[in-house]
Design a protein with these regions (language model features):
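Aromatic-rich peripheral "rim/lid" segments of glycoside hydrolase catalytic domains that contact
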Residues: 46-54, 194, 212-257
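Active-site clefts of carbohydrate-active enzymes
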Residues: 116, 176-204, 225-241
Length: 257
């Protein structure tokens, strides 16, 4: 593999202000931007020596050619492309419009390994967005896609069976498209950190799934989405407390598995 599969996604607003990536046993990070924390002069300097993977978040960002010029000048090897274009409150780009955006990416990418647009569900489940996008793409444009970026959030848990079903969905994505996979967001949309039973479910899910991801050679990288511990709906998925950077029990599981 290119580096340790395990990474972390953090923003400048709250997630990344206090956490020390050296405590996380991760090999890379991204921040939903094409500029690294170092280039932003971000207050938390502890990310400066960690591999950064840039992203074209959506149409609101700088021109594609400028982003690629920066990526190449910095020597970055990878680029993530378009964050949840299937959602109106995210990058919100229609599949037919994405054809033109993707062509721009392909024409500018050079030797950069280019990730797919990351829809909000498994690509194999995205009949309204991913399927028409993929089916209308020319063969050379498909070939230019170095890996598929996957987002997935659990809303229920039925024991180990749910974790195994998750891994089966990852397998299905590989078997359908035969592209390496980066899981750039995954977590639970459920359970407060004060819900002991809920926390136990999330922890069991993580242990099973990370073991499975590490065993699958076609899964190149993954990064858990860490909600804050203060989130009453999703705090059980927190890897650390945003204000202090202190790891949670789940965070320690992420580190050690």
């Amino acid at each position: 593999f290119y580096v340790t599969k395990k990474g972390v996604c953090v923003n400048t607003k709250d997630m990344g202000t206090a956490v020390d990536p050296a405590s996380m046993n991760v090999g890379w990070y991204y921040n939903w931007d094409w500029k690294s924390f170092k280039d932003m002069s971000f207050s938390n300097k502890k990310f400066d020596d960690l591999e950064f993977v840039p992203m074209i978040w959506g149409d609101s960002m700088t021109e594609t050619s400028e982003i690629f010029d920066n990526v190449k000048s910095k020597g970055y090897k990878y680029l993530l492309a378009y964050n949840e274009p299937d959602l109106k409150w995210e990058s919100n780009v229609r599949p037919d419009v994405m054809q033109y955006r993707w062509n721009d990416c392909v024409n500018n990418k050079g030797n950069v390994r280019l990730g797919s647009p990351a829809v909000s569900v498994f690509p194999t489940w995205s009949n309204d967005w991913w399927t028409p996008f993929w089916n209308s793409m020319a063969a050379d444009k498909k070939n230019a896609m170095s890996f598929i970026a996957v987002h997935s959030y659990q809303k229920s848990y039925d024991g180990a069976k749910s974790a195994l079903q998750y891994l089966q969905a990852i397998d299905e994505c590989w078997e359908t498209y035969h592209k390496p996979i980066w899981i750039t967001e995954f977590a639970f949309w459920k359970f407060s950190i004060n819900d002991a039973a809920g926390c136990a479910k999330v922890q069991e899910f993580m242990k099973i799934v990370i073991k499975g991801l590490n065993e699958r050679s076609y899964v190149e990288r993954y990064s858990w989405f860490s909600f804050n511990t203060t989130d009453n709906s999703n705090g059980a998925s927190a890897l650390w407390t945003n204000s202090t950077g202190k790891l949670t029990d789940l965070g320690n599981i992420y580190v050690n598995n």
